[in-house]
UniProtKB/Swiss-Prot annotation:
One of its GO terms (biological process) is regulation of translation. This is Large ribosomal subunit protein uL1. PROSITE patterns: RIBOSOMAL_L1. Keywords: Repressor, Ribonucleoprotein, Ribosomal protein, RNA-binding, rRNA-binding, Translation regulation, tRNA-binding.
Amino acid sequence: MAKKGKKYQEAANKVDRTKHYSVEEAISLAKETSIANFDASVEVAFRLGIDTRKNDQQIRGAVVLPNGTGKSQRVLVFAKGDKITEAEEAGADYVGESEYVQKIQQGWFDFDVVVATPDMMGEVGKLGRVLGPKGLMPNPKTGTVTMDVKKAVEEIKAGKVEYRAEKAGIVHASIGKVSFSDEKLVENFKTLQDVLAKAKPSSAKGTYFKSVAVTTTMGPGVKIDTSSFKL
């Protein structure tokens, strides 16, 4: 493994690796130890006590963070007829039908989120092998396959984030930027944590929030004390 740089080591030395901090302390410390020379993202990782091999323990969804993520999302909408106008008026960056299928097949990816009306999924389905691995395939569970394209686009633009438990049961998500106030980051964190608590599968046994950490882009991780987390 490559040796971390001096700046990283100095930042990491400020974090007690044996300690689990309160949410407020952890977020403040993560911001303090950010070493990026840009407005870094603040990321969280929840390791959940679930078995993702079981169909009833898959966790996937989306949540609108009260203070957004600080990142502007470029939205592509696949729609027909009056839904095209609806999407455009809601602020979608790109709206169309099969012409965007062809563009994507040719290697175009100037977008961050894809929304589709159900009647367009036959066309969008052709892109499964391309969009799937990038996590861009529209999905009803995340509200990106819907006839209410206005709501979908507005929520994404307002700071909606998708979450999904990986094989090891870990959910990664961005909760904002280092430039955010501690209060706004804590509020975003608690909103996401509350959603994950409500998503706990009834068949999941043992400790649900196994470990949680917060970090910034390129910065050291800070462990969070989960003992006060409510389920």
